[in-house]
A protein has these predicted regions:
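Amphipathic alpha-helical regulatory segments at dimerization interfaces
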Residues: 41, 57, 108-119, 126, ...
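Amphipathic alpha-helical effector-binding/dimerization core
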Residues: 88-189
Length: 295
């Protein structure tokens, strides 16, 4: 597997190097955590991994590497497809189904977004959430493509897609609402990516841009892969005011369509509030079920 600065392999190397060092409490990164790092190597372009190469990336011996893979196979998270080659296993499908039933944001979002199909004529609406250092699309309504002058433009950021934290409206609106120490840590670790995304060439400029986004209450961007696609995102906060996700609307990048979707911002913000309320209600109902079972 070729490695580059921004590849999953390079991030895994950085993780192993930094997180294997003793922490302030004197702990080291556990073998379980190192084993689970293997799952981070799977991407849309890397759908199988080789045991020998992973052993080198993890900095462990051949026997340890094989043991990690065997344990992941025993759990159903991986399956061997050939000599030394592994892909994701069937347990992942089972977990995905359980996630559909149990995730509060997903269930609340699906309920609300069902009532928003009226704004999805030649537009796609996505529900996004923060996952580690990236943003994940977890639900989608509307078409899989947007038509522009009789040309069908595919939506590249559909359900299950991971978006870079600094690129795109759905990500930037979440980034702007992170707590200050998270934003500061992001800047210290990812200055090059922040600059490349046009979010600032200094800490002061970066912080100022995020403050402006928060005050504005929404973000619009033009597609990096297709500049004829316009993206508009608004934040979803929980009952405590903390960011929990975003609603991302994709449409044609024309003056007329831009005006139309900007007029939809109050509606989108109202629906985000509904998602937050339904999410809290879903959590309370889950707690009630658990308590009734336990007591």
């Amino acid at each position: 597997m070729p490695s580059s600065k921004n590849s999953p392999q390079s991030h895994l190397k950085e993780s192993v190097v930094s997180e294997s060092q003793p922490s302030s409490a004197g702990n080291t990164r556990s073998s379980v955590a190192r084993m689970l790092d293997i799952l981070d190597l799977f991407t849309p372009t890397t759908t199988k991994v080789q045991v020998d190469e992973v052993g080198q990336l993890l900095g462990v011996g051949r026997s340890t590497s094989y043991r990690y893979f065997q344990e992941l196979c025993d759990s159903g998270l991986l399956v061997q497809q050939g000599k030394g080659w592994y892909t994701l296993g069937s347990r992942v499908i089972e977990l995905e189904q359980l996630l559909q039933l149990s995730d509060p944001l997903l269930n609340a979002g699906k309920t609300v977004m069902t009532d928003m199909l009226d704004i999805c004529q030649n537009r796609t609406l996505l529900l996004c959430t923060l996952f580690k250092d990236r943003v994940l699309c977890i639900h989608q309504i509307g078409p899989d493509h947007i038509t522009h002058n009789n040309e069908k433009m595919p939506i590249y950021r559909g359900r299950g897609s991971a978006l870079p934290l600094f690129q795109g409206a759905g990500s930037q609106i979440i980034l702007a609402h992170l707590v200050p120490h998270q934003i500061r840590s992001m800047y210290l670790l990812r200055q090059d990516e922040i600059t490349a995304a046009g979010l600032g060439t200094s800490w002061k400029e970066f912080r100022t841009n995020l403050t402006m986004i928060r005050k504005q209450g929404f973000v619009t961007t033009v597609g990096k892969l297709n500049p004829r696609v316009l993206a508009l995102a608004v934040p979803i906060n929980n009952y405590a005011g903390q960011i929990t996700g975003s609603l991302l609307l994709l449409c044609n990048n024309t003056n007329t369509e831009r005006e139309h979707v900007l007029n939809l911002i109050p509606r989108l913000k109202s629906e985000c509030q509904r998602i937050s309320e339904l999410k809290l209600d879903f959590i309370r109902r889950q707690d009630l079920v658990v308590n009734n079972k336990l007591f």
